[in-house]
């Protein structure tokens, strides 16, 4: 995996266009000196999606990137939930093989083990929205 980062300040519409109501309500946003509506990034997904879309054909596939970005959300502070925090992200783009999902899960396990955690310290639960939707549709009908 290759490290990447993006700007901590992005155009406001990057987040308001497709983010959920909860994220939009937690934005630190303002108008800068150039009269542009901007926001401090609350999550990395829109930033990395913009970066990939802008130069996708120039990248060798699959693209395997990770980051530990600084993020900002205006939300009620509580234990473990700060307005400024860092978050580990790992993504594989340009590959639809389930082996990519397995690779990301293996990476997660390696990261947790690097913190001296063992199998007794964490549980990984897998789920599939499509599988649950299929199950629900077939049980109801």
What is the predicted function of each stretch?
Residues 1-141:
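TRNA-recognition modules of translation machinery and tRNA-sensing kinases, especially anticodon-binding
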């Amino acid at each position: 995996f290759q490290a990447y980062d993006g700007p901590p300040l992005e155009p406001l519409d990057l987040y308001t266009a497709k983010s959920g109501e909860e994220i939009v309500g937690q934005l630190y946003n303002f108008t800068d000196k150039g009269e542009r509506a901007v926001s401090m990034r609350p999550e990395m997904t829109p930033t990395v999606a913009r970066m990939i879309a802008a130069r996708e054909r120039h990248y060798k596939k699959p693209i395997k990137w990770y980051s530990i970005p600084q993020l900002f959300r205006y939300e009620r502070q509580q234990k473990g939930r700060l307005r400024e925090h860092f978050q580990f992200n790992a993504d594989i783009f340009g590959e639809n093989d389930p082996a990519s999902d397995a690779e990301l899960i293996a990476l997660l396990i390696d990261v947790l083990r690097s913190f001296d955690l063992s199998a007794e310290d964490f549980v990984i639960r897998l789920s599939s929205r499509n599988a649950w939707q299929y199950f629900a549709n077939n049980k109801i009908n």
